[in-house]
Amino acid sequence: MQLFWVIFLFYLMICFVNVACLEPITTFGVITGGSAALAALGFNYNTIKLNTYCRWYECCTPDYIPMNMKQLKEELEQTIFGQHIAIDVVSKALNYHYKNLEKSSKPLVMSFQGTSGIGKTTVSNVMKRAIYKKGMDSKFVHKFNGRVSFTLVDRANVYKEQLLKTVRDAVKDCPLSLFVFDEVDKMPPGILEGITSTLDHGESNDNIDFTKAVFIFISNAGGLEISQHLATLMRRGESREDTQLHHFEKLTELSMYNSNGALEKSGTIENALIDHFIPFLPLEQRHVKKCIEQEFQRIGMPYPSKERLDAVLNSVTYEKENEFFAVHGCKKLEKKVGLVAAND
C-alpha cells in the first residue's frame, strides 16, 4: 500500500509540475515511466496517457484534432477567391465525413485539379489548420510531393511499398490522419496502386481502420480543359458563379485518368475510389486584384494606392484564347507586390 501512495503522489507531481524547466527527453521519460507504473497497478492506461503525456505532446484526441468546420468555411471564404465550387464541396464533404465517422465505410478521397496559382494547395493548408490544433505542423498531416518524394521512375515499385507502409503506420497511429499528395501528375505511374485497398475497403488484414482518414490528390491535370469549358459556358451567357460541380466533374475525372503521372489509367479511378473530382477555376482580373490586395495587407500595407494596384495588375499575363483568365493565377504575385512596395 505504501508503494501505491508513492506512485500516486508521483503521478500528481507529473500532472502539476511546471515542465518548462525539464528537458523534453527527461519529461517524456518521466511521464512514460509514471504512466506505466500506474497502469501496472490497475489504472486505465488511456486515462493516464490523456492526463500526462497528452498534456504536452500531440495525441490523436479531440483536443489536438478539433475538426473545426466553422473555421474551415470562414477561412476558405476569406482567403480563396474565384473558387465557389471548391469552397462549397470541400466544406460540405469534410463536414459530412467528420459528422459520420462511425458510419463511414471508406476514407474521404478528393482530387483538386486546375492550373497553377489558383488555390489548390492553399485550400489543403486551410484544411490542415481547421482540422488540427497544430495545423501544418501536426504529426498527423502527411504530405508527399511528386517532384521531391518520388523522383526516380525506375524505383516506382520500391516507392509503392514504402508508401503503403507509411500510410498503414500513420493510420495505425491515428485513424484521423490527413494525406496530401501534391503534383500527382509528376509522380511515377502506378505508385498509388499500392494504397488502392486502403482507399476502398477501409480495413486491412491487420485491423487497421482507414475509414476515418482523408486523402487529397492535387494536380494540374485538366486545367486547360476546365478553362476552355468555363469560357464556353460564359460565352453562352452563363454566369461563372452559377456553375456547379456537375458541369466539370466528368471532365476532370477523364483528364486525370488520361494524364501522365501516378493516376494515369489508375485503378484508383477505375474502381471509383475518388469521391469528388473538384475543379479549380481559372482566375479573372477581379480575382487577381483581390489576391494583390490581400498580399499588400499581409506585408503591412492594407490600403495600397490605385497606382500600386495597377502596377502589379499590369504584370499579369492572360491566356491568348481566353483573354479574361490569368495564366498563372495568383502564383507570382508575392514578389511582384514586394517589388512595387519597395518603390517608395
What is each stretch, according to the model?
Residues Q2, E23-L41, V126-R129, T268-N271, ...:
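C-terminal alpha-helical "lid" subdomain
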Residues N68-L108:
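Pre-Walker A (pre-P-loop) alpha-helix and adjacent loop at the N terminus of AAA/AAA+ ATPase modules
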Residues S219-A221, R235-T268, D275-V288:
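Conserved AAA+ ATPase "SRH/arginine-finger" region at the nucleotide-binding site
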Residues K106-K139:
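Walker A/P-loop
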Residues S138-C174:
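Short glycine-rich substrate-engagement loop in P-loop NTPases that contacts/grips substrate
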Residues R168-D169, G190-I216, N220-L224, A231-R240:
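Conserved catalytic/switch belt of AAA+ P-loop NTPases
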Residues D182-E183:
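Walker B catalytic acidic pair
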Residues Q2-W5, Y11, C15-K70:
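Extended, charged/polar low-complexity intrinsically disordered regions
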